[in-house]
A protein has these predicted regions:
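P-loop NTPase motor domains
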Residues: 1-265, 280, 339-340, 348-366
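Conserved ATP-driven motor cores of ASCE-family P-loop NTPases powering translocation/secretion/packaging/pilus
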Residues: 257-362
């Protein structure tokens, strides 16, 4: 099978890379700690339809930060409209070598707004004006027209938020890494491949790239399984997602985990505590956990995790013998037996689990 491994600190590839290569595996690396040691990853290379544009924008919004407008959803929705319009134009109209985040950032940087002149047209306005003249129903034109409903001061605030969200792309190394693609994510189900996603466990500045990679990976492989291979990939793809809470949010994961297994894709989410998953996915966390066939507990002290695991393990029946002795004029003795239910592993017992032991819970097995 193929492996996709989250590799905090980059130690896994050093320990296993050579062995995998000797056993016929292709090795792919996305290194967000040291971009000079990374292969190129261009999310735009995996856009095949308008739906993919919307998925990419959703992932970008959920895993990056704007300028923090107090939680007002208006600003995020306005940003989303602009990203959708610009990415739609880049994908549908720009030359192949310009289909990347670098072009997106340059277009936003060139969008000058003048508050005192509502009729001023910047270079991007002129691009969309020409495109509208050729094709009024163009997807990108329709999205851009909605963005242009905002007034000058509002538009400037939206652009500032966009600039803050995409500020990381001003780093030359990141611009180079995302300029074109070498990962070939859509081929991981075709032949044995090991993809190592190296990320920092102390700095999450570039973790949105890892989340974006997983999001596109799941969608690409599911589509390829259905469209090319009749529902099942020829090579099983196993995702070992360590430090899952630090990666960010994969949109619609609660639906993906319920459907990927039938397409020869499996996912192993590794967390420090169950509460981390709930912080990311809120009510959908229970759905994600419910779709997992196995649960491996290596120890921990987080109360919610311990309580839910204790309840999931259930109870065992124990026999209790009670003896009594009464001393009066005459001495009498009594002995009674009863059966009681006891937690198979109490919260206290789980909290002090031996470091050399673990608890594995399998679906359908007690």
């Amino acid at each position: 099978c193929s492996f996709i491994c989250t590799d905090p600190k980059g130690s896994l590839i050093c320990e296993t890379g050579k062995m995998l290569q000797q056993n016929g595996y292709r090795i792919k690396v996305l290194n967000t700690i040291n971009f000079k040691k990374s292969m190129r990853y261009n999310p735009f290379s995996y856009i095949h339809s308008v739906k993919d544009i919307l998925k990419l924008v959703t992932c970008l919004m959920q895993n990056t930060r704007g300028d923090g407008k107090g939680g007002d959803p208006f600003w995020e929705k306005a940003e989303q409209l602009l990203y959708t319009a610009l990415i739609g134009y880049i994908w549908l109209e720009a030359p192949e070598e310009e289909r990347n985040f670098n072009t997106l950032v340059e277009m936003i940087n060139s969008m000058e707004v003048r508050e005192d002149d509502e009729n001023f047209e910047n270079s991007v306005d002129l691009i969309f004006k020409d495109l509208r003249a050729k094709n009024p129903n163009h997807f990108a034109v329709r999205q851009y027209a909605k963005f242009k409903l905002s007034a000058g001061k509002t538009a400037k605030s939206i652009l500032v938020s966009c600039g803050a969200r995409l500020a990381v792309f001003d780093i030359p190394e990141l611009r180079e890494v995302t300029a074109y693609d070498e990962l070939e994510l859509d081929t991981l189900g075709d032949k044995k491949t090991a993809l190592f996603l190296i990320m920092s466990d102390t700095d999450d500045s570039f973790n949105f790239l890892i989340s974006m990679c997983y999001t596109q990976l799941f969608n690409l492989l599911c589509e390829k399984a259905d469209d090319v291979y009749g529902g099942r990939l020829p090579v099983h793809v196993r995702c070992l997602i360590d430090e899952y809470a630090n990666i960010g949010q994969i949109p619609k994961l609660e639906k993906l985990v319920a459907t990927i297994r039938s397409r020869e894709i499996s996912a192993c989410l590794i967390l420090q505590a169950q509460s981390q998953l709930k912080a990311l996915y809120k009510d959908n966390a229970d759905t994600i956990i419910g779709n997992m066939d196995s649960w491996l507990f290596l120890g921990g002290s987080e109360p919610t995790t311990l309580k839910e695991l204790s309840a999931a393990l259930g109870k065992e029946t124990i026999d209790i013998a009670n003896s009594s002795e009464n001393r009066g004029k005459e001495v009498s003795h009594g002995l009674s037996y009863q059966k009681l239910g006891k937690d198979l592993a109490s919260v206290d017992e789980l909290a002090v689990l031996d470091g050399g032991k673990c608890i594995l819970q399998l679906r359908g097995v007690r």
